[in-house]
UniProtKB/Swiss-Prot annotation:
Residues 1-33, 44-68, 97-150, 284-302, 784-803 have a biased composition (Low complexity). Residues 1-68, 92-150, 164-220, 284-306, 415-445, 779-808 are annotated as: Disordered. It is found in: Membrane. InterPro entries: Glucose_repression_reg (IPR052292). This is Putative uncharacterized protein DDB_G0280071. Keywords: Membrane, Transmembrane, Transmembrane helix. Its main location: membrane.
């Protein structure tokens, strides 16, 4: 407890925010020791004992000043966040001004203090002895302290750090009595704690030894603190790179902190030596105990019985147990001058100490920042491990052969042991894990978001800050993996297909890249001649190859087209017909091309032809070939249109043959082949290669034709016979030639398949040996018969027979030449 009295010179009270840098009173040799920095060596050379220079002995003894004892109160925690507060420079300045204001008030009380030196020396010796005993007790008791709740811990830290200068010259006697009572109570508590701790010391040692053995066994079997089976080399390299990076950062930070702490320790050691030398010099110069050196160093300490105390700081102060008579003695002027000089000296020392304290606080702040950074890095490591394990599970499938066995690790047992250790913290104060857990209990602010991150852990079981560490983080990761494994197995097929596609794509890209580099090279490997060769290939060789390839393709297409359009040879196997057919086939074009005009030499002459026959044939076949073809087309169209009138006889055969030949549905002969056969028949008189069809048609005609009487008596005879006989037998002979030609043309145009199929003319068995032009032969035969018309009724029968013979020839030629 501290007496926070208000100064009269200041308007109002000062806030308890900054620690005292020095004590400004008559005995200015007393000062406050700085806080212990966070050093891994845990140096004992950092702090002074009893808060600074102790008072001298009685002037009669003339003993040298007591050597200062080093104080180490408690082990330094591994992660002490927020142990100290940063002291603002303004607060330091205000504290310095307040101390200067108090100097003026303290000068008025110098006489009282000087007159009571002898009385205070005895008290100071007693107090020093008690303080030394207290120090020894504190060294043993603070090593067995344990943690409580976070609120109590923060309050104690504030009590240790946030204190201010006590205005010792204005303290009243009542306040001093209260303080003495409190000190006595504290001493009693310390004694009780010391007794209790001694009783429990043996039990603590036994428990700690057993736990140390168990821990050593665990570390021997599990040196990596978590086995992670990695499926591929790439995942292993990712983990190693992350750890390597973090280890480098940790190493740099730790080296920086150690170097700064070493510099600070060296500076404080030098300051200590300077103070000792100055104190010895002042003692030798005075020769006797001055009032400034006869201070009562009773050594007011903090509550040493507090269980959560980490470092004990001693603030020495004067216990002004002055009587009323001491106020009347005036101070000596030389002593006053010496006191002023000493105050100036210690004011300079206070400035130096303040700089060191600021440096220490900066290092502490840096350590706190590093702790927060380390917490973030631990979170990042856990996230990366979670991603890697999930990726491995996705690759291995729902039932992998090698799994990430995090459940069977002994870390679960480790967590149980750690929980038991947290329950037995009062008996296990020297355990490193317990210290880390204690610090995590007090510094759970950095891990609060990490523990309660439901999105990351995906669990409703929140982690307590007391039990949280890397092992619990791995357990939470393991739980999230098991929980998400069923959902990830549904998307495993799509992921595998995507990975296969990506791998195939990467392989093709690599192959193309290697081929390109092999041909063209890179910017560094390509040469001038290689560039020239590439340009020559692109500009010269490639167009030539393309042109030759194009010509070859065109040649193949034309050859195939010519093979399809090769002429189909029709006719007898004689040389003349074959040559003529090939000549016609080579000269043919598509269907719309012009038809060749047959020469007069190709038409064989008949021995029975006469001048009248040639004249009549000229009437029917003009010089233009188009008229002949038009006449034949009319015959063909009439045959095609009226082929359905008669269902028996030769008409069926003729109609079927005509439909098959024209339509091409059954024979498979194309239109160009039909045209070729038609032109060949017109030009040569040959009826085509289908001789069997012609012979069958003639045989069917001979078999179906009856005698003339049946035809005359039939129903079709009047329709044909009247037109034939009536027109052919005319009484007038003057117009015989013209009427005969007109009659022949009309008969030819009026013939139908139905009429021809039922004609039964005599002499049908005799076939003409000459295959002349059908139109010309029909006209010649018919005209010769019509010119020989009888003049009397006696010759009517002979003329009728001649007309029938001409009609038979006409039908034979029509059936033969289609």
């Amino acid at each position: 407890m501290y007496n926070n009295s208000n100064s009269n010179n200041n308007n109002g009270s000062r806030k308890r925010s900054s620690p005292p840098l020095y004590i400004n009173n008559n005995n200015s040799g007393n000062y406050i020791s700085p806080p212990s920095p966070l050093s891994p060596k845990q140096t004992n050379n950092f702090l002074f004992n009893n808060g600074g220079f102790n008072s001298f002995e009685n002037p009669q003894q003339q003993s040298p000043p007591q050597q200062q004892q080093l104080l180490f109160t408690s082990p330094i925690p591994t992660r002490p966040q927020n142990l100290y507060q940063y002291i603002d420079e303004n607060e330091l300045n205000t504290g310095y001004n307040n101390s200067n204001n108090n100097n003026n008030n303290n000068n008025n009380n110098n006489n009282n203090n000087n007159n009571n030196n002898n009385n205070n020396n005895n008290n100071s010796n007693n107090n020093n002895n008690s303080n030394n005993n207290n120090n020894n007790k504190m060294i043993t008791t603070t090593t067995t302290t344990t943690t409580k709740s976070n609120n109590d811990y923060k309050k104690k830290i504030k009590k240790q750090i946030n204190f201010k200068l006590d205005n010792l010259h204005e303290s009243s006697e009542e306040e001093e009595e209260e303080q003495q009572e409190e000190e006595e109570e504290e001493e009693e508590k310390e004694e009780l704690n010391y007794i209790n701790n001694n009783n429990n010391k043996n039990d603590d040692d036994n428990n700690s030894q057993d736990e140390d053995k168990e821990e050593d066994k665990y570390h021997e079997t599990n040196t990596d603190f978590g086995l992670l089976s990695v499926a591929s080399k790439e995942d292993l390299m990712i983990c190693l790179n992350v750890l390597k990076k973090e280890m480098g950062q940790f190493k740099n930070l730790s080296q920086n902190l150690l170097s700064r702490l070493q510099i600070l320790e060296n500076g404080i050691g030098q300051e200590k030596m300077i103070r000792l030398l100055n104190n010895n010099n002042n003692y030798n110069m005075n020769g006797s105990s001055d009032s400034s050196d006869s201070s009562n160093s009773s050594g007011h300490s903090r509550n040493n019985s507090d269980e959560n105390m980490i470092d004990c700081y001693y603030v020495t102060r004067n216990n002004n147990n002055n009587n009323t008579n001491s106020l009347l003695i005036p101070p000596a002027p030389p002593q006053l001058q010496q006191q002023q000089q000493q105050q100036q000296f210690y004011s300079q020392d206070a400035v130096m100490i303040s700089t060191y304290l600021l440096e220490v606080q900066k290092i502490v702040e840096k350590q706190r920042q590093y702790d927060s950074l380390l917490a973030q890095r631990e979170k990042y490591w856990d996230i990366e491990l979670n991603k890697i394990t999930m990726a491995i599970l996705n690759k291995l499938g729902p039932n992998p052969s090698t799994t990430v066995d995090l459940l069977n690790l002994p870390m679960n047992n480790m967590n149980i042991n750690k929980n038991n250790n947290s329950n037995n913290n009062n008996n296990n104060n020297n355990h490193n894990y317990n210290k880390n857990n204690n610090n995590n209990n007090n510094n759970n602010n950095d891990f609060s978001n990490f523990n309660n991150d439901d999105c990351f852990y995906n669990s409703n079981n929140s982690c307590n800050s007391e039990d949280f560490d890397s092992f619990t983080a791995l357990n939470n990761i393991n739980n999230s993996i098991i929980r998400n494994q069923s959902s990830n197995s549904l998307n495993l097929k799509d992921d595998s297909e995507e990975t296969n596609f990506n791998s195939l794509k990467s392989k093709t890209n690599n192959i193309f890249k290697r081929f390109y580099i092999y041909l063209f090279g890179t910017k560094k490997t390509i040469t001038f001649w290689k560039k020239v060769a590439i340009i020559a290939i692109i500009v010269i060789v490639w167009p030539l190859i393309a042109n030759l390839t194009y010509k070859f393709i065109v040649y193949l297409i034309n050859k195939r087209r010519l093979a399809k359009t090769q002429p189909f040879i029709i006719g007898n196997n004689n040389t003349s017909n074959y040559n003529s057919s090939t000549a016609i086939g080579k000269s043919l074009k598509p269907i719309k091309s012009s038809i060749l005009v047959p020469s007069s030499s190709s038409l064989p002459s008949s021995s029975s032809s006469s001048s009248s026959t040639s004249s009549s044939s000229n009437l029917l076949l003009p010089s233009s070939i188009n008229n002949g073809t038009n006449a034949f087309k009319k015959i063909k169209s009439s045959l095609m249109k009226k082929n359905s009138d008669i269902s028996s006889g030769v008409g069926n055969v003729v109609s079927s043959v005509a439909s098959n030949v024209v339509g091409g549905s059954g024979s498979g002969v194309g239109a160009p082949d039909f045209v070729k056969a038609f032109i060949q028949g017109v030009s040569t008189g040959d009826g085509g290669s289908n001789d069997n069809l012609t012979n069958n048609a003639l045989s069917s005609i001979t078999n179906t034709f009856g005698n003339l009487n049946t035809v005359a008596n039939s129903s079709i005879a009047p329709s044909i016979g009247s037109g034939l006989i009536g027109s052919s037998i005319s009484p007038s002979s003057s117009s015989s030639s013209s009427s005969s030609a007109n009659t022949a043309s009309n008969i030819i145009n009026n013939f139908t398949p139905s009429a021809l199929s039922q004609l039964n003319l005599p002499g049908s068995s005799s076939s003409s040996s000459s295959f002349s032009n059908p139109v010309s032969s029909i006209a010649n035969n018919f005209m010769s018969d019509s010119n020989r018309s009888p003049s009397s009724s006696s010759s009517s029968s002979s003329s009728t027979s001649d007309s029938e013979n001409g009609m038979l020839k006409l039908v034979r030629n029509l059936l033969t030449h289609r």
